[in-house]
Amino acid sequence: MNFQENLAALDLEYLWHPCSQMQEHQNFPIIPIKKAQGIYLYDFNDNAYMDLISSWWVNLFGHNNAYISQQLKNQIDDLEHVLLASFSHKPIITLSQRLCQLTHMDKCFYADNGSSCVEIALKMSYHAHFLKNQTRRKKLFLSLSNSYHGETLGALSVGDVKLYKDTYTPLLLKNLTTPVPKNDHEIENSLNALKRLLDKHSEEICAFIAEPLLQCAGNMHIYSARYLKQAVLLCKQKNIHIIFDEIATGFGRTGSMFAYEQCEIKPDFLCLSKGISGGYLPLSALLTHNEIYNQFYAPYEENKAFLHSHSYTGNALACACANATLDIFEKENVIEKNKALSGFIFNTLQNALKPLMEQQVVSDLRHLGMVFAFEVFIQTKERLSLAVFKKTLKKGLLLRPLNNTIYLMPPYIITHEEVKKAVAGLVEILDELRKG
């Protein structure tokens, strides 16, 4: 047993991995990673893997990015962490100012992961309505079908992906779901369904929560900005808060800095995480407006404070990485560069997959910014997603399909040559699976 195999065996003995059926790893070994550089992960046998999903959608500018790493090292020498109640630090003050300026919002509230950020938004919306109207009638949340907002109980309550939700349904909050349009032909029907729901329940609804334009864990479903804009206007007319979950879609992933910018509307609450620290350290931020903040601003005796906290809220090291990430966006014209890069990736996929599309093995090739996805229809002995995952690893590619949806969300530093190599390898794998 070599060093890599020994580590994998120890892993199985002591670790329980997320979103994994551990029994499968008895025959399909876990891969311990020794180091990473750029878009590549390296195991202890020096095998390289192209990280084509940005390590669960977090890594924007490559692993071991020289600039972000240096800023992190600089911060370690000054301050690693301090509680954020009654204390603060320069990295978080700078980051908060920059995020507010980027989003044209007023205040930042921090946590350390996306699900917690959603929980904060739900609590804050409910609490703000209560403080303003002194009524507890507004206690429901409205979300889109096929949506995903995290895996804590509150976040699961406003999600609609059965794989994650069904087991825990008896524990979840009662909420409302309105249909997301599957295509532009369904926009009017979806809006009419929303109108009927609002006519019946608007007095009970705290907030409408949505992932703008792209439902990532919902098989990378892209939906209309026109629908979202109209849905938001309908909710606003009924005094319903708007929560945009940009945990996965923020920081350039959909082609603009934030996806909601493409809808020309602003939320009451904006949830950010994943790419915020460039993929280095856990961090999330909820942004809101002074109109919300002022509901809580009062003498202590009035008991209006928002009492929510996490031990590592606003960690100084994570904030230093986030500031470094924003520096790169500012200095390197990332959004404009990504427009050209995303076009190249899509065209490469389109050309390479054309024969498989003609054979109806592949369909619905789509992209939004730096997100690319398509459906695969191949019969395999084991489930398709696992078969693709295994074969791509052997080709040196890291992909984790969602059911029959294969997607790419690569770091923004991927080169044209790396794109061509990755796509060629992927097509070879699909051909192998098709031929059995």
UniProtKB/Swiss-Prot annotation:
Amino-acid positions noted as binding substrate in the UniProt annotation, renumbered to this chain: 56, 148, 274, 309, 400
Origin: domain of life: Bacteria
UniProt enzyme class: transferase
A Pfam family hit: Aminotran_3
Any single Gene Ontology cellular-component annotation: cytoplasm
Biological process annotations from GO: biotin biosynthetic process
Residues recorded as bearing N6-(pyridoxal phosphate)lysine in the entry: 274
Family, similarity comment: Belongs to the class-III pyridoxal-phosphate-dependent aminotransferase family. BioA subfamily.
Assembly and binders: Homodimer.
Name of the protein in question: Adenosylmethionine-8-amino-7-oxononanoate aminotransferase
